[in-house]
Each structure stands twice: as C-alpha cells, then as structure tokens.
C-alpha cells in the first residue's frame, strides 16, 4: 500500500473548529442556492398563471392569435419586428488561452446562476479589444445556440448580470445574446417565454434539423411573442426584475464564499492560520 502524508491538526478541538468554519460557509452557499431556486420558482409560477393559463383574465373575452387564444387587446409581435440585438461572439483561430478575458460558451448556458467556473476558458485581451460583438453587458438573454448529438437538440437559456459570472466577459460562437434595446424586464420575460412548452418544442424541432444540431438567427427572430408594451408584460417584468437581481447577487456571494472556503481549507489544515477558540 502506498504511503500518503496529510497535514491534519492533531488537536481534536482544532479539527472541530475547522469543520465548523467550513460547514458554516457551505450552509450559507446552500441557503443562497435554495433562495435562488425559490425565487425563480415563484417567478415561473406567476408567469405560467398569467401567460400560459391566463387565470386572472378568464372572465374576459379571448381572441385567436399566432399564440392561440389570448385575452382580447393583447398584442403579439414577431421578435424580428421588435427592436433588438441578436448576436454571437467568436474565438481566435488558435482557440482559448490560459489567462485573459473569460469566454462564455454553450456549456455555461445551463439556466439561472448555474455557471460552472471549472470550465472557464479565456481569450487574450488584445483579441477581446477588437471584437465588435459578443460583449456581455448584463441582463441580456443567453441562448444555447448549437451543439449536441445529430438529430437531437435541447435548448437552454440564462441571464447574466450584476457582475455575475464576471465583470468583463464575452460570448463565443456557440451562444446567442438577445437584448431588446436594454429592456431588462422584457429580457427576463423572454427568458420565461422561451422556457414554455410551445417554444421549447419549436427550438427542439428547428435545432434537430441541422447536421450540427443548433438554431440560427432566423429561428429566433421568427418567434411570435407577447409585445413588450402589453400592460401585463410590463407588470410581470417589474415583478421579476428585483427577484433576478437578488438571484445574481446571491450567486456572486456564493462565488466569493466558495473561493474563501477553498483558500482557507489548506491554510487551516496546515496550521498556517490559527483557529482561535
């Protein structure tokens, strides 16, 4: 059997205090994750109630539309007809580098506050400075653009902001950024709208057609959506925006706590940092 050496404090009391410190950090991270899940679930429930089931509007008249039967007076538009920016980024020919500006790829678009820092890749600062597209400014809708097995495409979405996952980062060529002229509230509305069964099925079908599974700009811009000037859409955005802001702040705090935990552990175990009673 091989011999391994571990730096473990001999004092049992010190071991317990170290475990207590690390456990408190883990508990706070878990609490933030639960809060974020609850906040998104709350927003999702309101969205479904208003824009899928139309519960608050069932006593009124409904009319036919490109989205099916909807409350009378509601406007529907194609994304192509709503002022927006839909773009992707790119990477240099040589690929990623070890240090520089973070480059966000499809593997990072996994829902809200689910960025995997262990998979972060970078582009050099000089290349980033020349890019005319793909910079993440905050609260744009990130769309998983392409990738996966032939004939099989599962779309996913995310919204970054408030310095999460980074203060400065760019997209690569496998992610779309959709922004309705800086309308954060409508971008958030679109996040939930794209997650509805109807739109997910549409993306599934469109993405599976290509040799390399994925969607293009036309696929996105052809989508019909409730117009941003609908009163109910505006009210939902005003409700959901503070929730998303808090979720992003919690995610940033979790990143700080994770780094603190990972930095403290070896220093506590080695005795470099003394554990006070």
What are the residue ranges of the model-derived segments?
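A short glycine-rich beta-alpha junction/loop motif
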Residues: 1-16, 166-176, 203-234
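Non-catalytic DNA-recognition/assembly elements of restriction-modification systems
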Residues: 7-53, 57-90, 222, 226, ...
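Short coil/turn segments at secondary-structure boundaries
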Residues: 57-61, 92-99, 118-119, 204-207
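Sequence-specific dsDNA recognition surfaces
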Residues: 80-95, 107-144, 148-151
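Short, glycine-/Ser/Thr-/acidic-enriched flexible segments
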Residues: 84, 109-111, 148-150, 164, ...
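Short, ligand-facing micro-motifs at secondary-structure edges
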Residues: 110-121, 144-171, 188-192, 201-206
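Glycine- and charge-enriched low-complexity intrinsically disordered segments
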Residues: 180-198
